[in-house]
Regions:
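Short coil turns that delineate tetratricopeptide repeat
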Residues: 32, 66, 99-100, 134, ...
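TPR alpha-solenoid repeat register
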Residues: 3, 37, 70-71, 105, ...
Length: 353
């Protein structure tokens, strides 16, 4: 890639979308035949909510018969925002049989199913993503797709399923990124000792790695702190602020977006600070075109309802709960967090009368 192309990509994953768009446009001016430049520009335009320009960029890439996993994935995210179900499936189909692309798009599709609470379908598509990567002997990629699935299970309250999937991933790869996500999943599942040990080891071995020490480790440590000291969780997350809109490695498509904000919102909820919590969870709506099918975006809607209850804004709380339950109208009925949401919403009804 050119210097402009490299910078456009780096700025995109750092969440600096305006600058990324400028660099990516210059890269394309100099060489309009490189697929990833189009992907960077689609990503940047989508983050900026300039959806027409993003769509035009996807179309331009198609006219040049250009494609790679990054570009197809970015166009997939655009189709999700536009609620174009047929386009989503076409993009998944377009990656079929292509090394390094098929598994990426399948994992993307699994996040879409999870966004709507369809866990069984999400698991099945994740299984296909894992198998696709393994067929290409890309064992770390396979493990990461398995961990993406495990992370969703942990967030949905399916802790045993999450642990089972983590064990499966470790059988595929023992890479740094695999252990990093393992630590986060364990933290989100309440396994304090094992997670803490992994986090300490990663921080010691990679002291200069920004993604590890300013995004992943603080997010996991804050998740652990939630169980004993909400104020400490908020303090630990302070260092993540400049990188909140980033997609740091290991990149799991959109499944990790705004993780520090989500955990910070949880900490404020536990402190009883509904207004502050709502501000964090509202970020998923504010950055909807960047969050796309991140399953946390759906859960943030539920957390908004909980936040509004703390501020005695009952009508807003009821609306937030209703919007979450509408999103999950076809969800698998046995998901723990769905049971909780329905029970909370049922109790809310008399308060609103």
């Amino acid at each position: 890639m050119s210097a402009h192309g490299d910078l456009g990509y780096l700025l995109a994953i750092l969440g600096q979308w305006e600058r990324s768009a400028q660099e990516s446009k210059e890269a394309l001016r100099l060489d309009p035949t490189v697929a990833i430049y189009y992907g960077n520009l689609v990503f940047a335009f989508r983050g900026l909510n300039r959806l027409d320009e993003a769509k035009t960029t996807c179309q331009q890439a198609q006219t040049h018969n250009l494609e790679n996993a990054w570009l197809i994935s970015d166009c997939y995210g655009l189709a999700f925002v536009a609620r174009e179900a047929s386009a989503l499936q076409e993009l998944v189909n377009s990656a079929r049989g292509k090394v390094g692309a098929e598994d990426v798009l399948l994992s993307n599709a699994s996040d879409t199913e999870a966004f709507y609470g369809r866990s069984t379908k999400a698991r099945e598509i994740s299984r296909r993503a894992v198998e696709s990567a393994l067929r290409d002997n890309r064992r770390e990629a396979a493990a990461l797709w398995q961990l993406n699935s495990a992370l969703r299970e942990a967030e949905f309250g399916n802790v045993e399923e999450a642990r089972k999937q983590v064990a499966a991933a470790l059988g595929m790869s023992q890479s740094r990124d695999v252990h990093l996500l393992q630590a986060l999943i364990l933290a989100r599942s309440g396994e304090m000792a094992r997670s803490q040990s992994l986090l300490d080891d990663l921080a010691a071995r990679f002291p200069l790695n920004t993604a590890i020490n300013r995004y992943w480790v603080p997010t996991a440590r804050a998740s652990l702190a939630l169980q004993r000291d909400e104020a400490q969780a908020i303090e630990v997350l302070r260092i993540t602020a400049p990188y909140e809109l980033a997609y740091p490695d290991p990149t799991l498509q959109t499944g990790i977006f705004l993780y520090p904000a989500f955990v910070r919102g949880e900490a404020y909820l536990r402190e009883g600070k509904g207004g502050e919590a709502a501000a964090e969870f509202q970020k998923y709506a504010t950055y909807r075109t960047a969050a796309v099918n991140c399953p946390l975006g759906a859960l943030a809607q539920l957390q908004l309802g909980r936040s509004y209850l703390l501020t005695s804004e009952v009508d807003k709380a009821r609306t937030a709960y209703q919007e979450f339950l509408t999103l999950w109208k076809d969800a698998d009925p046995d998901i723990p967090i769905l049971h909780q949401a329905k029970a909370e919403f049922a109790k809310l009804q008399p308060l609103a009368n």
